[in-house]
């Protein structure tokens, strides 16, 4: 875990990617459920 100089740790990439994916999916389904998804 000490060899992270010049590179981003994979767990950080995975965590950020997971949060972004969950957020986008949540917004998409919330918009569709609210009737706003059809305009996107």
UniProtKB/Swiss-Prot annotation:
PSII is composed of 1 copy each of membrane proteins PsbA, PsbB, PsbC, PsbD, PsbE, PsbF, PsbH, PsbI, PsbJ, PsbK, PsbL, PsbM, PsbT, PsbX, PsbY, PsbZ, Psb30/Ycf12, at least 3 peripheral proteins of the oxygen-evolving complex and a large number of cofactors. It forms dimeric complexes. Belongs to the PsbJ family. It is a single-pass membrane protein. Keywords: Chloroplast, Membrane, Photosynthesis, Photosystem II, Plastid, Reaction center, Thylakoid, Transmembrane, Transmembrane helix. Gene3D superfamilies: 6.10.250.2070. It is found in: Plastid, Chloroplast thylakoid membrane. This is Photosystem II reaction center protein J. The lineage of its organism: Eukaryota, Viridiplantae, Streptophyta, Embryophyta, Tracheophyta. GO terms for biological process: photosynthesis. The keyword Membrane applies. Its main location: plastid. It comes from the Eukaryota. InterPro entries: PSII_PsbJ, PSII_PsbJ_sf. The gene is psbJ. The chain crosses the membrane at residues 8-28. One of the components of the core complex of photosystem II (PSII). PSII is a light-driven water:plastoquinone oxidoreductase that uses light energy to abstract electrons from H(2)O, generating O(2) and a proton gradient subsequently used for ATP formation. It consists of a core antenna complex that captures photons, and an electron transfer chain that converts photonic excitation into a charge separation.
